[in-house]
Design a protein with these regions (language model features):
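Bacterial N-terminal signal peptides that target proteins for export
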Residues: 1-9
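Axial heme c-ligation environment in periplasmic c-type cytochrome domains
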Residues: 104, 110-130, 145-170
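Electrostatic cytochrome c docking/interface patches
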Residues: 29-53, 65-69
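Hydrophobic helical h-region of N-terminal Sec-dependent signal peptides
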Residues: 10-16
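C-terminal motif of bacterial Sec signal peptides marking the signal peptidase cleavage site
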Residues: 18-21
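Periplasmic/extracellular electron-transfer cofactor-ligation site
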Residues: 49, 53-115, 144-153
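An amphipathic alpha-helix signature
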Residues: 134-138, 142, 169, 173
């Protein structure tokens, strides 16, 4: 009787093992957690477009054109900054500097107590940031340095680099 019980247990264990190996695994495989690269966006370009929108980069770096509804981005000059052909603000700087701030109609040049600021060209062209390294870009944003060069002058108002520096390196890359 004892031998029958051992044989029965062995056969049962063998059957269970065989059935468990032959049965179709219907359990859903958990997909490996992907590192959230690009903030959940499908590409680095889409992530960059999102950051430009949220950061308001084109508010100052894309010249505006006037319409019946007010200023709108001139998409033909997207992120080109205050371009070479645009006139400098024609104002009495001493009066402006004592009273506050003046902004041009294109919203790409500002006059204030610090002097005159012109928004930079952020296009991928060599006249913009096309020749910058990743390090230059991070230095400009994190340290507020002109052209991303540590030994250069600070970025001028109204560039909000003090707020932008709070973005992580991964967000900025």
């Amino acid at each position: 009787m004892k031998n029958k019980f051992i044989v029965l247990c062995f056969l049962s264990a063998t059957c269970i093992f065989i059935f468990s190996q032959c049965s179709e695994n219907t359990a859903t495989k958990k997909e490996p957690e992907m590192k959230q690269k690009f903030g959940g966006f499908e590409s680095q370009v889409k992530w960059g477009e999102h950051l430009v929108l949220l950061g308001g980069c084109s508010d100052c770096h894309t010249p505006k054109k006037m319409t019946p509804k007010g200023p709108v981005n001139d998409e033909t000059l997207f992120m080109s900054g205050h371009t070479e052909g645009m006139p400098a603000p024609d104002i009495d700087r001493k009066e402006v500097e004592s009273k506050g701030l003046v902004v041009t109609q294109t919203l790409t040049a500002w006059v204030g107590p610090w002097g005159i600021s012109y928004s930079g060209n952020l296009t991928p062209d060599e006249t913009g940031i096309g020749t910058w390294t990743e390090s230059n870009f991070l230095t400009a944003i994190k340290e507020g340095k002109y052209k991303g060069i540590s030994a250069s002058r600070p970025l001028m108002p109204p560039m909000p680099w003090e707020q932008m520096k709070k973005l992580s390196d991964d967000e900025l890359k």
